[in-house]
Each structure stands twice: as C-alpha cells, then as structure tokens.
Curated annotation (Swiss-Prot):
It comes from Macaca fascicularis. Red blood cells. Residues 3-147 form the Globin domain. This is Hemoglobin subunit beta. Heme b binds at residues 64, 93. Involved in oxygen transport from the lung to the various peripheral tissues.
Length: 147
C-alpha cells in the first residue's frame, strides 16, 4: 500500500495520463540494461545487447518495456492493494526467473529519471517525491514473495 496525499495522487495520475507507455517503457528498461549491465543476464533471449545503441534499439527490449509499464499502470489503479495486484508477477520473478529484488528498485529509479527527462519542468520535486513513493511501493510489492 502506498500512502499518498490527495495532491500526490492527483499529481501521479495527471502526469501518468500523459505518458506514452510504449516510448517510456522501452526507454526505462533499455536504460536499466545499459546503466546496470548485470541486469542483462535476465534478458539473454532478447538478442543483441552488446552496446547502448543495440540495447536502446532492440525491439524486444521496447516490447518488454511496454509490458512492464502496462503492469505499472495497473498498479497505479490499485495503489491500495499493490501486493495483491503484483502477487503473480512477484511469484514469477521470485520462483521462476530468480530476479534479485533489488532490480525492482533500480528499475523504479530509472523510470523516475526517464519521466523527469520527458516532462522537464512539469516533473517538479513534489511530483518526483510522489513518484518515488509509488515506485518504492511497487518494488516492495514485487519483492513480497521473496520474504
């Protein structure tokens, strides 16, 4: 559960309504793979990840980034029940994929950077603070099955 003030919730949902999930999702996942290259080991089936340009232009990275942000969007609609919303994804990433839960925090922080880049002055410190709460809540929910 993420505790947002009404103003924070409004800021998050208003900005999210302007997000191009296809573009931002691919960029966020791509940046994760470039900035934290050890995360690439979970995406060996994606083909060429040999350079930043290869990662950022990889259609499988873009497609999976879109899928990731689709799940994130679903979470924004269920901020009062993030653990329930992400229960199946948590189980998949824990039991089958064996993803280090720290990677969820990294991706959340990368997403915040990408949003700041895309929205500039509109991404005020207050909006960032609200998004930091949300991505921390999502990361915690995704790590739930690890505990």
């Amino acid at each position: 559960m993420v505790h947002l003030t009404p103003e924070e919730k409004n800021a998050v949902t208003t900005l999210w309504g302007k997000v191009n999930v296809d573009e931002v999702g691919g960029e966020a996942l791509g940046r994760l793979l470039v900035v934290y290259p050890w995360t690439q080991r979970f995406f060996e089936s994606f083909g060429d990840l040999s350079s930043p340009d290869a990662v950022m232009g990889n259609p499988k990275v873009k497609a999976h980034g879109k899928k990731v942000l689709g799940a994130f969007s679903d979470g924004l609609n269920h901020l009062d029940n993030l653990k329930g919303t992400f229960a199946q994804l948590s189980e998949l990433h824990c039991d089958k994929l064996h993803v280090d839960p720290e990677n969820f925090k990294l991706l959340g922080n990368v997403l915040v950077c990408v949003l700041a880049h895309h929205f500039g002055k509109e991404f005020t410190p207050q909006v960032q603070a609200a998004y930091q709460k949300v991505v921390a809540g999502v990361a915690n929910a995704l790590a739930h099955k690890y505990h």
